[in-house]
Amino acid sequence: MNAEIVWRPQPRQAEFMRRPEPEALYGGAAGGGKSDALVIEALRQVHIPHYRGLILRKTYPQLSDLVDKSMAYYKRAFPTAQYNATSHVWVFPSGAKIYFGSMQYTKDRTNYQGKAFDFIGFDELTHFEWEEYSYMMSRNRPTGPGTRVYLRATTNPGGVGHGWVKARFITPAPPGTPIVEQFPVRMPDGTEKVLERARVFIPSSVFDNPALLENDPDYLASLASLPEAEKQALLYGSWDSFSGQVFTEWRNDPGHYQDQRWTHVIAPFAIPRHWKIYRGYDFGFSKPFSVGWYAADEEGRLYRIKELYGCTGRPNEGLRIDPVEQARRIREAEQNDPMLKGRTILGVADPAIFDESRGESIAAMMERGPHFLHWVPGDHTRLAGKMQFHYRLAFDGEGRPMFQVFSTCRHFIRTLPNLVYDESNVADIDTRQEDHIYDECRYVLMENPISPPRQTVQPPVGDDPLELHRRARFYRV
């Protein structure tokens, strides 16, 4: 008697499922069979009695599709397996268990405190924040001898976690190439040992799922008919253009760094001594603090010429240094930079640093000697500030915007394009993101407001570094 084949992976699904790295992300575009691969992958060790697996979605209602898939596959593969709809857990003949869970709010991660899972799968990883993902890494540990411990995730571009997911899995290496990170650990005997942990991104698209295209020939046309940004993300898997992106007008074209046309990122140049200089500041302790220096030319165009970003290198994690030390670093940066040394600089900061309700304000601490760093409170009006970004990012007939960024300001270039809208307040950005540079810059823009441009011009199709107006190129693995 021939055994029934419950599920057969497509080639790209098989590539994802055979990867040895402790972390792997699968997806990019829609229709690649991401959720099916995740649900099946969780079954790999159900022959081990003490095995525990966990599949997560951001909210409980979003779990229903995954549970439905498990109903279709698990019962056929293991007829005596039982699903408990109250506790959302499958119990297999060996005693192994696969749980389905959610984490709507970051505080919900404590629901998993003290628990261990050999396998953890995240469906739609960009819906999660870094703090949630990193906490669950600590829950990913063996429940007993003989189990493999690893994390798997699937996602499309976009969502509140787009920035950190892109920085962790997409930017560091080409698809299919292991990203190896080293961690020094001090051992009990005082020696230092360097440990390594690898992760990888496996791209997929609807073209990797011929079974779907055969069953639903119109699905490809449905993706192709989406608005441009959404089509680039869901059809072609673009991480530079996606649904929910706030600043879709942002352009970073190295081919125009020198002539400064049709790009917001430009090559650094010497700042004339008569231009005004501004310094923006957003305080942070456990989250990053951000300082940006800006020059204003005779036409009112602003240039971000330098930045100081207080982060550890991990997503949205601050250096935890006090205001006085931050002031010292800011003053040191100005004294060591020929563009800034000896110049009059107007500092504009988050109004919250002037709060004296709990004692001496942050602004007062920074203004004391020996650093004497003076600030004026910035305009914190959020929607008006966001519109100043749109007004200044617009291109005129000659391809010049009213705001440009030196190519050395890598954290600005990294974070601004990743900002997404708040689903609860669709006119504003989602503040759960790494938005500290955006806030700091907003105070400077509001100090120098401009009127809406009378006419804006779209970049020529030939000047298209993100390939938003042509078929996207596919990564080869």
Residue positions per predicted region:
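Walker B catalytic acidic pair
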Residues: 123-124
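Walker A/P-loop NTP-binding motif
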Residues: 35-49
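ASCE P-loop NTPase helicase motor core
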Residues: 127-209
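Inter-Walker segment of RecA-like/P-loop motor cores
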Residues: 61-118
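ATPase catalytic-site recognition across NTP-hydrolyzing enzymes
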Residues: 208-283
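Pre-P-loop entry segment of helicase/translocase ATPase cores
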Residues: 1-22
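Conserved RecA-like ASCE P-loop NTPase motor core of nucleic-acid helicases/translocases
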Residues: 51-63
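Mg2+-dependent endonuclease catalytic cores in nucleic-acid-processing enzymes, primarily RNase H-like
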Residues: 292, 300-433, 449-456, 460-461, ...
